[in-house]
Amino acid sequence: DLYDVHSDSPTKSWYGLGDWDVMASGNWIGDGGRPSLPSSSTLDLIGAIDPIVPDYHLDGNFLLKPISQGGTPLKIEIAYGEYIWITLRSEIGFAAGLPGHGILVEQQDLSFGDLDSNLVNTDPSKPWVKIVEADGNDALLRGADYGSSGDPFSFGDRFGHTGKQIWDNRGRLVPWTITVNSLSVD
């Protein structure tokens, strides 16, 4: 489960991936009638996707199809066992009830938590996976919301080394920048 399954341990309550993943609060979208799809990290865990793994040393353009239409996410290793997942989330199909749409960025650190004991997202200071929120307010981490329209990145946004900066869990700024050059769900 990607919500805080044990909110009293070890720190405080938070909402994990919130409405962005069926394994968090996304199973309750539309009163449970239209749950969200799993996140890219969840789809990878169950072997349901084969992500694009770009070489960040090279410039490149990537056209992402919405995950709700069978699209494939990008996966970038930023440290040993730590990844950035980049996924297009649209308002189509099971994604229709999401709190927003655009480029959703997850940061996953496999060294945090205990997957076998279902203790992966128990501590917001050491999440197994979290959303890198475009608006920068960290509302999911703080337990202030279950996801918002400000979480995904949109046309013109940048993230990585510049724009919304991404640091690995060892305190190193990533060496690449991604710019959202266009955004369409067609």
Question: What are the residue ranges of the model-derived segments?
Answer:
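Extracellular hydrolytic enzyme modules, especially secreted metalloproteases
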Residues: D1-L98, D109-S111
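Extracellular low-complexity, Gly/Ser/Thr-rich intrinsically disordered linkers
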Residues: F62-D186
